[in-house]
Amino acid sequence: MKQFKRLMILSFAINAFLISAPTHTYASSTDVIKSEKTATRLNYIDTETIPYNKSFNDTKVGGLSGISYDAKSKKWLMISDDRSEENPARFYEAQIHYNKHKFNKVKFTRMHYLTQANGTKYPNKASYNPHSQDVVVDPESIRIDPLNRNHILYTSEGDRNLGFNPFIRIASRTGTLINDLQINNPIKKDDQNKYEFRNNQALEGSTFSENGKYIWTSMEAPLLQDDQLPTTESGALTRLTKYNRQGDVITEKAYSLDPIPKKPGKNKDAENGIAEILTLNQKQLLVLERATVQDKNSNFKNYIRVYKVDIASGTDIKNIKSLQKSHVAPVKKQLIANLNEQDIGHIDNIEGMSFGPKLPNGNDSLVFISDNNFNQKQQTNLTAFEIKP
């Protein structure tokens, strides 16, 4: 209970900071190039591997779990899910060039630390003071704000053990906190440990709506009160949530996760969940499902599928706290790519997804990024595809 009293004090302090902060003007939706794209399949272009020992601006490059492209500046942003263990929580700017055949250039150009309301960097678990207003962050997704390209959105998965809820924050392009969305739907932790998000399986994906007015997020795994985790025999229901910019839930849909595609070795691990989402158009999202299966020798294999989802379909569940005893219809989904069925070589722990520049033939491109977990046995890969409309 002390943790939750501290959270309330922390929330009050952040709100006080934000109220006293200068206001920011946004472009009108008519000034924004609406994201209206179509997709029927993905054609592989190329993969570029970032070396494990890559460093930049005295930080270790790794754990890259989110990626976002700014078509106006032609810059790419990549966020690390480092919980300030290797270096303080941060994101990178980069130049990434590719054509319809191959990657030509990947160059890191800037690094920015993410900061808290008091202007300090996020602490790690070891240095965190539970009597302070500090937060231990677990960054996952990053998006450039289409209504103000000097701003970014990023998500954190929270930490049940420390009493931190998942959050959605708006920051400057240099990492300074601007706004903290006061999300109030049932993803938040209760004080009896019976409900809400699972540790390290919470706000994994985010995307702005096609007009930039709204924010969609995805839960990697079902809430505790919604469903069991997927197995090799059955899938599970998780949530896609649409917020306005004040953090109010506009609509929420159930998403049916696939069963785990392969049986793990005896007493080994396996999971499947949503790794990222991306707005395709007014009616559809792309959803990236990632399954990880450990074999008998403790080796992990990743299974990556990309679905096109009809967000107008399915039951609106925003007022349903638990899905277990509710008869709800999930959104309709259509497979457009199974990366394991394409000849793309090694598939690592893909967590991020972003549209890139248009290709010379006018088709859109899509880039995935994998999170190496700061593990020398894993790879940080950028993988590019052509989107066939």
Feature-to-residue mapping (PLM):
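Sec-dependent N-terminal signal peptides of Gram-positive bacterial secreted proteins and lipoproteins
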Residues: 1-29
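Sequence/structural signature of beta-propeller domains
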Residues: 22-389
